[in-house]
Amino acid sequence: MTTTPPPFSIRQAALPVYLPTLLFAAGESAFVPVIPVIAKNLGSDLAAAGIIAGMLTVGILIGDLPSGWIIARIGERAAMLWSTLIALIGGSIALLSTTPWMLGAGIFLIGIATASFALARHAFLTSFIPLSHRARSLSMLGGMFRGGSVMGPLAASAVLAATGNALAPFWLMVGFTLAAGAVLLFLPDPEKTFGVVRRVKDRTGHSVTAGELEVENEGHGLFKTIHKNLGALLRLGVAAGIIQILRAGRSVLLPLWAVSIGMRDADTALIIGIAAIVDFALFFTSGQVMDRYGRLAASVPTMLVMSVSFMVLSFTHGFAAVDVWFIALAMTLAIGNGLSSGIVLTLGADLADKKNPAQFLGAWRFTTDSGAAAGPLIIGGVIAISSISVAAFATGIIGLIGMGMMIRYVPRYTPAAQSKR
């Protein structure tokens, strides 16, 4: 007599996927507000501090390249465990750093680990979560990431206020990452929790799960896929990449600005944490806006609000109430960013071949992550030759250019998605 397995519940993914994601994201976001302070303490100027902060997104970009192949070879769970180990090594290097560039090397390793962890958790959901629950599970995954982005800075603010040690958030990062690794390490085999999954052969004959095959295919023939889809990637891909420039600019410019106006570390982390709450509150609304009113209804307001906010910020450095302006614009940037949560992934899905999306999505991810990596480098370069105010204004101008590209190219490349009402 056979028994019918119990119906699947998203709660089954809470421990193997959602809790480690929450902890890993909290660890990553805990130290971001203090990178410029630590870099400055090690002898860096503002320009170099911006570049060092940007090593996180550069590491993510570089980590994107081999991660799919590695996950297909060692499995999703093992890849997440190795990612936590690499992140711990990066955090340890940052804690022990004696030069700005040693700090940058540690942050770069954390970026590589972040890329691998993100792909592995996506592959895990694809492999083990039934199709009927997949959209909700991916939405919940995004929510866990944003929850960690709230938890990290708020926890960092508390330990900074208690200790006065700028390195304390890196200790937090180590603690959160160890906790994520422990959850993954001591959980039972996923196939005992979710049931045995169907395995297939990849192009080399290696046995993989559906999720492992998907992320492996994303990286296969990357540059050939970029060349094949060059028109769309140079137009809409670059426009989406500029959204990532604005987002990365927000993550880097706000802590740099706080250092330049003499704000306390704990206050900076607290403001960034509260801004993350504002961002998080708009997470679900943005998806509804995109589905009901089209992609431009989310992307254009985001780029307009964030661009104008950066441009206004550039004029406030000498104002009497500079702290108040900083807080107000940090919240405005959070609102702008929250209005388009998921827009980059959604546009990529709109453009991808519905029968074989993985390779295009890999090229799309590489293009848009290039924007995220370029943002801090542009900011650091402009600060080096001019000032942080000019860097903020230039970021706003780039955002307005991207908005114009969105207005022109979204209707051309995604007419069906844009026509939704």
Residue ranges and their predicted role:
Residues 86-98, 305-319:
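C-terminal ends and interior cores of transmembrane alpha-helices
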Residues 43, 75, 96-101, 294, ...:
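Helix-breaking motifs and short loop linkers at transmembrane-helix boundaries and internal kinks
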